[in-house]
From Swiss-Prot:
EC class name: transferase
Organism for this UniProt entry: Synechococcus sp. (strain CC9902)
GO biological process: DNA-templated transcription
InterPro entries, A to Z: DNA-dir_RNA_pol_omega, Pol_omega/Rpo6/RPB6
Function: Promotes RNA polymerase assembly. Latches the N- and C-terminal regions of the beta' subunit thereby facilitating its interaction with the beta and alpha subunits.
Record-linked Pfam families: RNA_pol_Rpb6
Name assigned to this protein: DNA-directed RNA polymerase subunit omega
Length: 82
């Protein structure tokens, strides 16, 4: 699934897949507000990461990347470092 998410990120985001991932994150959380804050914080980190990377143009917005990453982490927690 990780390889699939990198394909999604590199080729652009399928809106229906992104919606399903977002709904899954919200549905499986105990606090919708905190989940929204996590997505926003991750998106902000990615935006600054992109900025530090010499402003490479990306077709995927930071919020979209954040949803894909957090969804993958939720679905496959054994792949997280540590």
């Amino acid at each position: 699934m990780i390889e699939c998410s990198w394909l999604v990120i590199s080729a652009g985001v399928d809106s229906s897949d992104l919606a399903k991932r977002g709904e899954s994150l919200i549905r499986q959380s105990s606090n919708r507000y905190l989940t929204t804050v996590r997505i926003a914080f991750r998106a902000k980190q990615r935006r600054f990461d992109d900025f530090d990377g010499l402003l490479e143009e990306s077709s995927v917005k930071p919020v979209q990347r954040a949803i894909v990453e957090l969804s993958d982490e939720q679905d496959q927690p054994d792949l997280l470092p540590g």
